[in-house]
Amino acid sequence: MYVASESDDTVSLLKFENNEITEVERITVGTYPTEIEGPHGITVDPNGKFWYLSLAHGNPFGKLVKYSTESNEVVDETTLGLFPASMQVSTTTGFLYCVNFNLHGSMKPSTVSVVDPVTMTEITTITTGSMPHGSRISPDGLYQYSVAMMSGELFEVDALGLEVSRTLDLESKMMKKDGMKSMDGMKSMDGMKSMDGMKS
């Protein structure tokens, strides 16, 4: 397991065995020795050959850095948006989706960067909400989800169409009697059929 230390510009490779955790290696990251560049999000690609790290504290933009899991050495890097944060790789599209958290910027809609991890090229950016975080890919690899912290919305991105497909207003939701959250605020962006109270 790779764990980032945002205030220390290091990544620890941890090994779990029985009831013990061992730090196998501590990897120094970043390119400016006198500045904290803020390693934030980490993900390993589906084939296990590479791991990716977002360096959030850019000037002004952050970076996505690609490492080899065999050597833990830098393979390539690319510039993303303001404070790139959490990310995952879709097993269906092969693309990496990284939210640009924009922690220090103005409270306006930010973006999800879509990156080809083979060439380390940012293909496009998709506008979502203010301060998006918590990027997750659906099990089938067809959708990317993130929550905009300041606008209180869940965004669903079509991983193939590269556009927002639905949004859910989280601030207006109430718990049902059975403890399950209502999904009646989920709005389709493309007219797709509504499901269990999701609005088109």
Question: Which role does the model predict for each range below?
Answer:
Residues 1-200:
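Predominantly soluble domains enriched in secretory-pathway, periplasmic, or organellar proteins
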